[in-house]
């Protein structure tokens, strides 16, 4: 209603003026009091709602000035480059309504320019950890799942700090394109080795360990690769096409040489043949240049990689337009449901097996079979050797509440934690190997597509980004090189946490 009819309003005013002439106990007076009271409550309720909305708008504007709370950011998409805040100065502003810090849980109102969900003290600590470095010159590192997202940022830290780094991925050519595209790649690309492998296939994992061990002492193992929610095969279409396209020449990229690349058979299949039961055979390694089906132009593959490294590639607007490519180079899965919300009897047996092989069995095989190489590094003069098992809160037993969803990923991470807790003490006492499990923090939202878009539209964003996740994984190595022996711990937000 825009306005009250003037004649009716005049009648109402006339009646109100007559009310005081009646006896206070008159029925008409009581009726008018009830009506006036109801009207006053409605007006008061409406005003409270307006004030609440004004406060929410004020606070949301401050949140959106931050890097992690920006409207351009959704899920784990971070443009493949560091996030940027639009705030001027160290802080984005002051909230009217206090919110709890993601790390320390204390309420705060002063919002950091970068982190929308951290109090000033925890934000300052996180900034310092994001930038910490250590000298790894001459050391060798093996990093699984190093092509994109957290893995890419871990690999960049290792390479920029001087380590000779071997990364594994199911899409090795995409990895080469990504790393070669970095502005400073000429400084370290010659120390990168890319291994195309499917960690869900134990025969390939064993072949990988043999290949790594043959190269001599190994200083660092980071078991980062994992399968959380199985994507539809179509999500990988562009990446698979890119594996059939030729790589650019080193000269065109402005570098002396491309990284060494080794690939195994059938690395890009939807499911490992051994697990699916279709066939089984021995994994065979192929070095770069041996097989080249260039059915599609390399330009298209490079374009898809560039999209994954472009700001806003997976923004809410891009999702709604159907053009989104996330930081991993994947097409978003638009299924109404996925295994993140599935309960015990709903999880597909094949996905159950894949998750166990990738998330816990592959790390077990890698750690056990490469232990002699780690021992050799210490014997050759290294202060310590390192194993970092990238875990998650899903594998923690001490949480007060466990929801019924994704039991298969929970049990895989719990197994990884138990391997760490069981073996870390003995490995340190015997061989001076520091093994820890690390939670990367809340970076990704694994909920089904429609729900993810809904909460993004409402202004929700994960509190941390990919660089924060990488910093948490890298931290035990930095601290170890500084003389602090962290082992047998489950680290959350850089501190030991209950198992």
Predicted regions, residues:
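Active-site helix of classical SDR
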Residues: 367, 412
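Short cysteine-rich clusters marking metal-coordination/redox-active sites
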Residues: 101-104, 119-122, 387
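Catalytic Tyr-X3-Lys loop
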Residues: 238-364
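N-terminal alpha-helical interaction blocks
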Residues: 1-98
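SDR active-site lid
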Residues: 403, 407, 424-425, 429-483
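Conserved glycine-rich Rossmann-like NAD(P)H-binding loop of the short-chain dehydrogenase/reductase
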Residues: 161-178, 193, 220-225, 233-259
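Canonical Rossmann dinucleotide-binding motif of NAD(H)/NADP(H)-dependent dehydrogenases/reductases
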Residues: 127-172
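C-terminal helical subdomain
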Residues: 3-25, 262, 269, 274-312, ...
């Amino acid at each position: 209603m825009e306005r009250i009819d003037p004649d009716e309003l005049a009648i109402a005013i006339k009646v109100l003026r007559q009310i005081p002439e009646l006896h206070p106990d008159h029925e008409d007076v009581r009726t008018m009091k009830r009506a006036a009271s109801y009207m006053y409550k409605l007006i008061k309720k409406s005003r409270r709602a307006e004030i609440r909305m004004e406060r929410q708008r004020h606070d949301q504007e401050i949140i959106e000035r931050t890097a992690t709370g920006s409207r351009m950011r959704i899920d784990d998409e971070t443009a493949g480059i560091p996030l940027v805040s639009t705030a001027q100065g160290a802080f984005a502003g002051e909230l009217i309504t206090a919110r709890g810090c993601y790390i320390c849980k204390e309420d705060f109102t002063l919002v950091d320019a970068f982190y929308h969900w951290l109090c000033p003290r925890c934000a300052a600590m996180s900034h310092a950890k994001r930038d910490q470095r250590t000298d790894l010159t001459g050391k060798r590192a093996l990093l699984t799942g190093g092509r994109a997202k957290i893995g890419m940022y871990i690999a960049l830290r290792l390479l920029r700090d001087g380590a000779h780094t071997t990364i594994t991925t199911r899409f090795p050519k995409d990895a080469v394109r990504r790393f070669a595209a970095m502005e400073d790649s000429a400084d370290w690309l010659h120390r990168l080795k890319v291994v195309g492998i499917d960690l869900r296939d134990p025969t390939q994992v064993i072949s990988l360990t043999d290949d790594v061990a043959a190269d001599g002492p190994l200083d660092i193992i980071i078991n980062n690769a994992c399968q959380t929610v199985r994507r539809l095969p179509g999500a990988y279409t562009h990446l698979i096409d890119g594996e059939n396209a030729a790589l650019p020449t080193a000269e065109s990229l402005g570098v002396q040489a491309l990284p060494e690349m080794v690939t195994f058979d059938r690395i890009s299949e939807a499911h490992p043949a051994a697990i699916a039961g279709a066939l089984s055979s021995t994994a065979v390694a192929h070095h770069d240049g041996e097989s080249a089906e260039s059915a599609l132009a390399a330009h298209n593959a490079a374009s898809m990689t560039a999209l994954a490294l472009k700001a806003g590639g997976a923004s809410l607007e891009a999702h709604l337009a159907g053009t989104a490519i996330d930081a991993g180079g994947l097409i978003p899965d638009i299924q109404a449901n996925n295994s993140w919300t599935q309960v015990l009897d709903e999880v597909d047996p094949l996905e159950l097996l894949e998750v166990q092989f990738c998330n816990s069995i592959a790390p077990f095989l890698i750690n056990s079979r490469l232990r002699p190489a780690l021992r050799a590094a210490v014997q050759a003069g290294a202060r310590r050797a390192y194993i970092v098992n990238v875990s998650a809160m899903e594998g923690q037993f001490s949480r007060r509440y466990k929801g019924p969803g994704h039991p298969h990923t929970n049990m895989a991470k719990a197994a990884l934690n138990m391997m760490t807790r069981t073996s870390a003490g003995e490995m340190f006492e015997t061989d001076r190997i520091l093994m820890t499990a690390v939670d990367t923090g809340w970076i990704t939202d694994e909920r089904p597509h429609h729900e993810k878009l809904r909460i993004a539209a409402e202004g929700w964003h994960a509190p941390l980004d990919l660089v924060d996740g990488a910093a948490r994984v890298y931290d035990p190595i930095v601290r170890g090189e500084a003389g602090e022996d962290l082992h047998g711990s489950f680290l959350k937000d850089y501190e030991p946490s209950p198992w």
